[in-house]
Amino acid sequence: MTLKLVKHEQTKVSLVVSDLSGGGAIRAFLLGQVLEKLNYQVEVIGFLFGKELYAIPPSNMSVISIPGKNYPEFFNSSKKLLNQLDGDIIYAIKPKPTSFGISLIKKIRSGRPLILDMDDWELSWYGGDDWKYSPTPKQLYRDIFKKNGALRFPDHPLYVKWIENLVSRANAITIDTQFLQQRFGGVYVPNGKDTAIFDPNNYNPEASREYYGLSGLRILMFPGAPRPHKGVEDVLIALEQLNQPDLRLVIVGGSPYDNYDEQLMEKWGRWIIKLPKCPIEVMPHVLAAAHIIVVPQRDTLTARAQFPLKLSDGMAMAKPVLSTIVGDIPEILGETGYLVKPSCPEQIAEQIQLIFENLELANERGQRARDRCVEKYSIEAMASSLQSVISQL
């Protein structure tokens, strides 16, 4: 694809992230790379409610973090962020009060155009449309006035529900799944990859396996944070069923949210190898070590609204991708992956066996996945969509 690059010497885009210690940072960094490809000046700015950045940003990308606090201290944190939010275009990541809410205030005060990106249905984490806040007067009092009261958290689902009603106030919306497009509208900008960096021709799989201490093992890789809806347990049950001593599931990065990782290790530790999170530039070297990339999403509201980045990880690196028939996944992979029913360890086990029995054939399918990724999910493909959005602001 030939991309027309336009010079934007004075045009700065501020990507506003609700919590840089959470998963939203990854989408922000990806969109930042796309905007840099279009020659915009990029700055990522957001609150930090945890101890450290969730993901290591691409080198040379400017990132500003403001300590995140609960109400009433959050008013001061917001003021600090608003004072430093100086992009010519404001690009809010996720419809949350801490990103989109702050960005709306900036838009109203400054008149600067505002784009909203959605890569999740935020309310799906709480049950979707069925979620209601119906406290007793006593509970409401506690939620507001107690030091750790629920309503003191700036992104409480009640506030998220309110702010979803303001989505139309954005000048433009970008989304990454059909589910979100049907619900909120917007322009499709997939969770793609820089296929020049993620190029399997630059890496030797055997050398990568040796570097990470994985030689002699057959590697299934899950690059990301395990959560119950992501189905990692189904892969581990499949490995238990196969009971072949050289099979391992390598989890890269782990979960910053809770102790779910430890629960997995406690139950299935013999099958798991954990690798630490790494900069995006190092990730292809890690992925090269895999024989199979697993994306075993379960059929939940949350999963249906997502475009798992792990898909484009595996596709870009020409790996066999084993995933489930959930949401957009079949359409993203086309005929280039291996699909099973969600929550079906038996089918996962069968496909693992099938892939390793015909590994040469599986790797050919992986190469077709890369070709598809270059065509549809590369940074260039994302940039083309995003350029059309920005040109209409």
Task: Annotate each PLM feature.
Residues 261-284:
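Nucleotide-activated donor-binding/catalytic signature segment of Leloir-type glycosyltransferases, i.e.
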Residues 1-59, 172, 237-242:
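N-terminal subdomain of nucleotide-sugar transferases
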Residues 213-230, 236-239, 250:
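Conserved donor-binding/catalytic core segment of Leloir-type glycosyltransferases
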Residues 97, 230, 279-286, 291-315, ...:
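Nucleotide-sugar-dependent
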Residues 179, 192:
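Carbohydrate-associated surface elements
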Residues 335-345, 354-360:
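Conserved acidic donor-binding segment of nucleotide-sugar-dependent glycosyltransferases
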Residues 354, 361-376, 382-388:
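A short, well-ordered alpha-helix in the C-terminal region of glycosyltransferases
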Residues 193-211:
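Acidic anion/phosphate-binding donor-loop and adjacent secondary structure
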